[in-house]
Amino acid sequence: HQPRRQRQMCIRDSTKPQGSLGRVEDFAIWMAGWQKKINPTMDNTHCLIYAGNHGVATQGVSAYPSDVTAQMVENFKRGGAAINQICKLANIQLSVIPIDLEYPTRDFSKEAAMGLEETIAAMQLGFDSVNQDCDLLLLGEMGISNTTAATAIACALFKQPVEAWTGIGTGLDEKRLANKISVIKSAIELHGQNFKSPESILATLGGRELAAIVGSIIAARLLRIPVLLDGFICTSAAATLTIFDNKILDHCL
């Protein structure tokens, strides 16, 4: 904890009003703690975007068909997405990793989305994709209908009402939103909410890209790499690790 404390002291003793930099101060202290550097660096920042397709898409829970996932991946690779511009501007190394897009997971409103073996394989892919020389890791995803999977995971984990946690995703109208809520409720009723491990809930309600995100988070923790998670889908996947330990995501923001 010494680099963290020293960074706190440096910020405290700087010629400026106390706390005037807001959360930037907290971010610098957090980075210093995980990197074990008084002056944390962002010289080798990586962004990993995982893509996967979901069988539950056949239930009409998204405004777009599943083949849009592959189209978006191609757009990423051509440099045509917002994340490409952000990474270019900030000198971040971007990797887009599609995972078996031609083989969607199964419809989890009727059966488990994946077997444990394929779930662990996706987690291993995410684990292996983290470069040990990285000093800050950004994680993102792409997958038509993965807001449905993320909401199902979050509601199962935190025992929350589905209506309160379900959004319009890529732009559902009221009728399709009601259908999405109904599909998630059916899945939770079918599978229950008492999951004993991250891999079991990911296998039942998740997707390959969500499992890969979890694998990357585990690798980053072991390598002391701080992680930035992009949005609800990433954080829902990450939250599965709290089944083990509430502090296991301390290296993530």
Set out the residue ranges of the language-model regions.
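An N-cap/entry alpha-helix motif that binds or orients negatively charged groups
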Residues: 8-40
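Phosphate/pyrophosphate-binding betaalpha-module
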Residues: 137, 148-212
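A glycine- and small-aliphatic-rich helix-loop capping segment at beta-alpha/alpha-beta transitions
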Residues: 64-68, 152-163, 244-249
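Short glycine/serine/threonine-rich phosphate/pyrophosphate-binding segments
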Residues: 57-59, 139, 144-151, 210-214, ...
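Hydrophobic alpha-helical bundle architecture
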Residues: 215-231, 235, 239-243, 251-253
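Active-site cofactor/substrate anionic-group-binding motifs, chiefly glycine-
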Residues: 38-98
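Single conserved hydrophobic/aromatic residue that forms the stacking wall/gate
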Residues: 1-7
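Glycine-rich, mobile lid/loop segments that gate access to catalytic sites or pores
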Residues: 108, 113-147, 152-158, 169-176
